[in-house]
Amino acid sequence: MRRRLSLPRFEKNFRERTQEAWAAFSQIEVELRQIIETDETHQRGEELVEKCGNALKTALRDTSFELGFNGEKYELILSPEGLRSRLFPLVYFQKQAPESVLEHWNIWVGRQL
């Protein structure tokens, strides 16, 4: 009987996961905007969070976020939840947002005062 070593399986690095997450977000952002625009009674909040969370989870696991509209642009607000260690990956993620997303969305890290 021969034994084989299996190679360790590494997850993709954060840069690659960030690219994948933005690609996924780009595919659903029109739908997110339509939901935000038409959901006047705020009945579809869970659906919004689920769709957006599924797109972002490739890069950002367990990250809190908010979605909204400020009167001019849609907003995705990523929260470091008071943890400095979460701040730097979120800022990197924010800076990698594609132009196609930034046409319609402001991407923020933390609450803007």
Q: Language model features by range: what are they?
A:
Residues 2-66, 70, 81-113:
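Long, contiguous binding/interaction regions
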Residues 74-80:
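Short cationic amphipathic helices and targeting signals
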